[in-house]
Amino acid sequence: LNDLERLARSPDTLTVCGAPEGYDSLIFADLARARGGVSVFIASDEARASSFDAALEFFAPGIDRMRLPAWDCQPYDRISPSPRTAARRAGALHRLAAHDGKSALIVVTTVNAMLQRCAPKSAMAAGGISAKPGGVLDVEVLKTYLSQNGYTRAATVTERGDYAIRGGVVDVFPADAAEPVRLDFFGDTLETVRSFDPETQRTTHQLKTVQFTPVSEIVLDEASISRFRSGFTKRFGAAGSGDPIYDSVSAGARPNGAEHWLALFHEHLDTVFDYAGDAALIALDPLVRDAREERLEQIRDYYQARKEAGKSGAGAMGAPAYRAMEPEALYLTEDQWAAAIEARPSRRFTAFQEPGDTSVDMGGKQGRTFAAERQADQNVFDVAAKHASALRKSGKRVLIASWSEGASDRMAGVLSEHGLSPIMAAESFEDAGKLQTNAIARVVLPLERGFETESLAIISEQDVLGDRLARPRKRRKASDVIAEAGSMSPGDLVVHADHGLGRYLGLKTLTVGDAPHDCLELEYSGQSKLYLPVENIELLSRYGQESETAQLDKLGGAAWQARKAKAKKRLRDMADQLIKIAAQRNAKSAELIEPPSGLYDEFAARFPYAETD
């Protein structure tokens, strides 16, 4: 057997040497294609999973692929994972449970996601319902299904897991759909199914069928409620009967944070390894071991903290006691992880060489970086062009990888000015292979570092220009609220998007609907109080001026809205003035000055920041 066949067919645990980052995704794609069935790549964290997934999109766009996320909340948290993340995870589990085991399916996931136990595979596989135009579907039955399987009723459907009912029209955003769907009923007859844009509410496609799957691993029906009540009382005794989580579930409600008692809603829990099956190929990032040890230590620390706090009979800041389940009930242990890996064919990637019969050398190495040339103040583009030309002469297929189409176009233009040609665009790895043999392919592929093999060389944008100074914009999450609120001190002034200037007094836990909710306590004029749920923290921003002379807004008053309207008018006036200036400039003419060819492209290519969308 050649090396690739051995990696694809061997049931043993093997180390894939000579597989630097980037090349590992190409090898993994080839293995998944050759094996068929389920192939799972476990990344050390979400950032690594995202970059690996993006590389797979380039190297193997034709192979069915999905992401399986972990919850985006801390272990033993009082809040649930975000609805979007919970829906993505539940949708991925349903899809994996329903897979036939034969066709190739790649699962890209993380250590955190794999350590989490899941709802039983049988429950997720059987948890879907489908409908098509002309069929009969009781709207009340659909409503009950959506409510029990984690969907949230909303006025307008915008996020995965939302649904809305307006007469004979039902809008739903299914777990694994790209867009929400609108179902038009006449009585119990489904007349049409359409997907629509959640922002404009306009129809995008007419659909012939639609499938709804759970957006939560908790199915809240009579059987699961009964199991939860029995299990909660058995574990925590009679004292647990007054717990807000217990009382909410007993009343048929889905309290915030209930997922952290997932084991009580089911007869047993499975693992992602169980979903993937015994024949699944498991591939491991080089940093998986460290990430696993760190995560298990974190889980133990959170559990011990909850356990110690629970001895006093109450949580922090007067919150109800947190009755935590032992880690083994919700997460895999070190031994269980090792046993699951050993029971399946597994491949550990590394860029280095390791001797032994269980190692397979794929002959890859990290590509050349041009750091020395940048520091020596040489023309790095000239050096890169000569290096690419030398690689081509050695018989390698050469690709220039950039992070965006604009950057790729600029890089190609600059390298062409320095004598590298022909440079041709390619959409995928397959397309690059179809170019004429002497062509350099320019591609959009977000690799941090390039690599070389016997027949292939990829030079990345970062190899030539140095590290990118990425400044991604992230929506603040409720799971980060303690850190964010911790950076504010009681007495600090904040601005609420709807209510204006107020004073932050601190975090406070309120019991609403028999469940605890963490809120930020804000004070306004007249000592009026506003309690802002932590999940809405993005509505706040810091007050950036001197606080001594600031006057608090009146809660519900018109002054804040008037100031906002005045500011908007000033912005419109400024925009009008800028438009007038632009029009005046456009009306004037002058002699055109042409810069030297390629000079601007070189300047633009050195821009170190990520381009905005």
What do the PLM-derived regions correspond to, one by one?
Residues 1-549, 567-592:
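Conserved beta-alpha structural segments and adjacent helices that either
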